[in-house]
């Protein structure tokens, strides 16, 4: 925690507090700025000390999310306040949550109160009437349908609609004018009086106007009744949501907790706020009881009155319409009507249960009540499960939206330029991107039900594929490691099992050679990583021994014994096994020949067995633990574990016979030439063993001479695959090298000062297997070819070595002539003049010319 906190300066923290302050002052400009700054500082300090933050970026992201959440909550309040028609003015920041009141039914006592202020306009009434009429006309017959001549006139009955509109207007006025209770009551009374006058006028007009209409069929009556019940249910549900938001706001918030920590001057204000909250809770309880009474009254009225019928336009008379005749219902229609009444009664029971527990309802729980379309990806999931998965996917991908929006222009540009697409296709491609982004950026307040989980999943896959394909391999691995770091220990165990199972699946599609060359297979998804089997915890037989007592074994449909023992001959094809049997016979015979040959050689001790498959050969004089003893190991099977070698040095494989390994107690370069031999005869092996010991003694003497000069640092390199031995000599002091041009322009001091180059030069000498009878070869590091000064060094070294080789060839010719005259054998050979020390002398001579 302290590591990332130290990277944040006080100026940055103050800047974040000022951002929160400016955001709050935009909504509440009349509030005291000093007090708002205290609240902003407290909010920033709380985010800074949150235990879940692990980095500076996480802290900045939490600040941004908090500002975004504050903005959403304030916009929601603004949208709720916008439902009323009062002029919107910037309100001061509330110290306590404001609880709107639901308009009580108008009583004669309220109508007699004299008004104290100008009545507010009630133009919402006409709008609500039009909306209600439009809603009802959607399920009624068209006004242009033909009329029957014998249909009696029916009076237009709109009293229920007008009363509902008046109730809605009174509720809206009461919600907006909650802060001034006395004045608002007067205004409400005035509005109620005006509404009553309008209702009277409407009723008079309705009584004077009569129209002709068709009688409703039983099915239309059922549909009309269900529609009215649904509208009434929606109105009551909105009132319940408002009450729930009020009760939720009355609980202690972050701002109130900060005020509790202020000096004693604010304690009096807190007591007043608590009293106001208690009064508001009592008023809310009264309003809940009134809603229950209204529901019962409306239910009784619906049973008494007949369903309203839409009136065709253009037909009016002054006669009063008689009551329509009740047509008998069929048994099927009676069952439908009974089912509709039962569903309405069930909705009323659920609503009453919510009224009894209003505090349990919150705006966040409304997301669980949203209808969802059935998912083809999860056919057995319930509505609640689909709803939860929908919002979990939205929250998981929202953190990538800023990065995705940043790369959208680049992706669209590449799409238009690569294939020269038409502008219409490019716009369609761009619109698809933006639609998917908007689909993911939804909130519970902005989403349009029903929720479609399949559509959201397709959008998520499309955006994530485009986003991950735009990342480099390094960024992909960083995200993979980031997801691993964020997981807990328990999740990492499941994560490890998934990785091992994933690798086991890849072996079905990728060969072992491919996996060994590439080192593994990676996936672009941030939560999947396919890799080569690690040696730490690997349950497969081809891996090293597992360090845990109970290794993780991947489960499949059929049980597979991965660690069960099987004979080696079953793993080898028939042709290969026959070759292996022949080789084993040769090795067994060679082992016996070596033991018999050492018994007859006076310079060597008789070979003896260390274990069943290993023998040791030693010199008579220098034998022992410190000598150049030769260890020979014969593998009995083609798939055995590698031999570790002697106590001091590791084992080396024989190139021609991979089932034979050798090692020594002395320097490995003393027996290195034996790796390049063909091990078929014991006599040849013992002969080359003695020559390699002489070679090793000569190399050790020459290296001791070079070390005594104290001019070079020496490093030896043993190439076991190709059976070669290299020695690298590097100068200890830096040398000033000059090119040919610099040597010609030594009089010009400026050029010498600017172009001088100092180097620690190195030369790599390869010692042949039959040294000293073959000359030393040299090479330079490959980077020397890039420098012009070192190219001159290489060209001069080549000339000197050619001259030395010519001299060596001349000596060999003279030696051959002498051997022929003296009848010596052809196998006699003189040592070469180009030794390790002579090669270094040539190297120093060339350096003097360049320095």
From Swiss-Prot:
GO molecular function, one term: histone acetyltransferase activity
Subcellular location: Cytoplasm; Nucleus
Keyword Nucleotidyltransferase: no
Coiled coil region boundaries: 231-307, 790-827
Keywords linked to the UniProt accession: Activator, Coiled coil, Cytoplasm, Nucleus, Transcription, Transcription regulation
An example Gene Ontology biological process: transcription by RNA polymerase II
Cellular component GO terms held in the UniProt record: cytoplasm; nucleus
Biased composition (Polar residues): 145-154, 308-319, 359-368
Domain of life the protein comes from: Eukaryota
Primary location group: cytoplasm
Entry's family note: Belongs to the Mediator complex subunit 15 family.
Free-text function comment from the UniProt entry: Component of the Mediator complex, a coactivator involved in the regulated transcription of nearly all RNA polymerase II-dependent genes. Mediator functions as a bridge to convey information from gene-specific regulatory proteins to the basal RNA polymerase II transcription machinery. Mediator is recruited to promoters by direct interactions with regulatory proteins and serves as a scaffold for the assembly of a functional preinitiation complex with RNA polymerase II and the general transcription factors.
This protein's name: Putative mediator of RNA polymerase II transcription subunit 15
Gene label: med15
